[in-house]
Amino acid sequence: MSTLLLVLDLIGTFVFALSGATAAVKRRLDVFGVLVLSFVVGNVGGITRDLIIGAVPPAAISDWRYLGVSILAGMITFWWPAIIKRLWSPVLVFDGAGLALFAVSGTQKALAYGLNPVMAALLGMLSGIGGGMARDVLLTEIPAVLRTDLYAVAALAGAAVVVIGNVLHFPSVAVTIAGAILCFALRLMAIRWGWRLPTARQPDQSTRE
C-alpha cells in the first residue's frame, strides 16, 4: 500500500503542477512564477492532508521527489507550451486528474493513519480540492470549488468509493482505481454538460422595490 500511495501522490503532484504551470503561462508569469505556482498547486493538498493526520514532516517537503516532479512539470510547461496547448482545455484536464488522484490517495492515507471512514472521505476530498484552490487564490480568482461545475462533489464521490471498498474489504488497488476513474469522469462530464449544484436565487428588482 505504501508504494501505491507514493505512486499516486507523485502522479497527482505532477498533473496538478502541470495545471498550475499552465495557468501561470497563460497569465504570462516569468519562469520563477511558473515554478512557484507549479510547486504550490502540486503540493498544497498533500501538505494539508499530512499536517491534519500528523504525518510530519509532510512528504512534499521531506522527499525530494515531490519537488523534482513539480519542477519538471513547470519546466515542461514553460519551455514547451505548444505541447500542452494541443490538449483539450489542458488546465481543466490536468486539474481533474489531480483532483481524482489526490482524492483517492488522501483517503487511503487517512485510512492508513486510523481515521474513521467518514473523516477519511472528507480528508480525501480536502486533499483533492486543495491544489485547485491554491492556484485560483494565487491568480486572484474565485476558487473553482466555490463557483463552478461539480468539483468537491466529484472528489467526495471518488473518496467514498475508496472508503466503501475498504469497509467491504475489497482489494485496495481496485477500489483506488475505481474511485479515481469515477471522480475524473464526473469532473469532465460536469465540465462538458454544465452540471452544477444549485445556487441561491437572487430577488428580482421589483421584489426589492
Language model feature labels by segment:
Residues M1-L4, L51-I61, S105-M119, I164-V175:
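Helix-coil boundary and interhelical linker segments in multi-pass alpha-helical membrane proteins
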Residues M1-T13, F39, P58-L72, N116-G128:
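Structural signature of hydrophobic alpha-helical transmembrane segments
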Residues A17-R27, D50, M75-W88, M133-A144, ...:
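C-terminal ends of transmembrane helices
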Residues F32-V40, D63-L67, W88-L99, A121-L123, ...:
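Cytoplasmic-side transmembrane-helix entry/capping segments in multi-pass membrane proteins
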Residues V36-V40, I47-I53, L122, L126, ...:
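Short, structured motif recognition centered on aromatic/hydrophobic residues
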Residues S38-G46, F94-Q108, L126, L150-V163, ...:
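Small-residue-rich segments of transmembrane alpha-helices in multi-pass membrane proteins
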Residues I71-K109:
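Ordered, amphipathic secondary-structure segments that act as subunit-interaction surfaces
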Residues W195-E209:
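Intrinsically disordered, low-complexity non-transmembrane regions of multi-pass membrane transporters
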